[in-house]
Amino acid sequence: MNPFPRAEISSSALQTNLAALRQQAPASRVMAVVKANGYGHGLLNVANCLVSADGFGLARLDEALELRAGGVTARLLLLEGFFRATDLPLLVGHDIDTVVHHSSQLEMLEQTVLSKPVTVWLKVDSGMHRLGFTPEQFSTVYDRLMACPNVAKPIHLMTHFACADEPDNTYTSVQMAAFNSLTAGLPGFRTLANSAGALYWPQSQGDWIRPGIALYGVSPVTGDCGANHGLVPAMELVSQLIAVRDHKANQPVGYGCFWTAKQDTRLGVVAIGYGDGYPRNAPEGTPVWVNGRRVPIVGRVSMDMLTVDLGQDAQDKVGDSALLWGKALPVEEVAEHIGTIAYELVTKLTPRVAVCLA
């Protein structure tokens, strides 16, 4: 087998995670968020595995067009909306919904001639202060959208949480109250809950939930693990040992000689590095799974390789598999060692890593 790293994507895990989220929010439809190349899992791979999802959320128009070209017929929603008036005929032609979060988008809708109206999800800034119309702007914007012939009726309504991944932070309740007060009595769907909302804030689930990271088997909450919610890691990042060598006490290893062995040991060199998207700043002690056990990274991660301490009596050999993250070694745990979040790890793999659907 070729020794280079690959991301093995489990279709059964994706389907298990969708089912688990439906169980968490039985009254809600599921807008499966597949932006950023399906969180690094492969856009079409994920969409084809999740054909039973009620819709798909994307960040960019080209992602939506790729899904349509790939035969996906489900509802598609551009979570950041459109950015040019010339995008609007594409939304119409390919039956793509759009978020409207800024006055520039509203003006383009009012000024463009379209063959039929576009389905709009009006985004309310309930407290994240990134995208969306403020409560003070909402009524005027809503009325303008209602008056616009290019906007399908009813208008759907949405917001996004700033702190839902902090289960003890009451700011999510503040945001829910603001959104619900502002939109009370209006027709159309409502969507508030991201992965953390769906898992930790059931009162936010509404008509649609928008899970992203949880679909891939990962918890959105630091210190938590997807398995605690019946989720299964959909990605296994695997490579191989390309060298096993005896290493003497007091000898350094790797660039800068930052790690020195305290005793005689055996080192393994794994064929993956920052050129593949594995973080260069992974510190000494970050775990890798080799032959049924965790072994620590030692020395600096280089472009194509990293080194692990297999232990003095190790029997590992060249060609043995090395798991960087997956079911046996949760990506949440690896992210915590590195000082980042699992989202960043799974989405930053480079094109050198083959993504294979299993």
Curated annotation (Swiss-Prot):
Keywords tagged on the record: Isomerase, Pyridoxal phosphate
Pathway: Amino-acid biosynthesis; D-alanine biosynthesis; D-alanine from L-alanine: step 1/1
Alphabetical list of PROSITE patterns matching this protein: ALANINE_RACEMASE
Function per UniProt: Catalyzes the interconversion of L-alanine and D-alanine. May also act on other amino acids.
EC main group: isomerase
GO biological process: D-alanine biosynthetic process
Reaction(s) this enzyme catalyzes, per UniProt: L-alanine = D-alanine
Gene from which the chain derives: alr
Pfam family, one: Ala_racemase_N
Entry cofactors: pyridoxal 5'-phosphate
PANTHER family: ALANINE RACEMASE (PTHR30511), ALANINE RACEMASE, BIOSYNTHETIC (PTHR30511:SF4)
Entry protein name: Alanine racemase
NCBIfam families, A to Z: alr (TIGR00492)
Binding residue positions for substrate: R130, M303
MF GO annotations: alanine racemase activity; pyridoxal phosphate binding
Family: Belongs to the alanine racemase family.
EC number: 5.1.1.1
Active site as annotated: K35 (proton acceptor), Y255 (proton acceptor)
Presence of keyword Isomerase: yes
CDD domains: PLPDE_III_AR_proteobact (cd06827)
One Gene Ontology CC term in the entry: cytosol
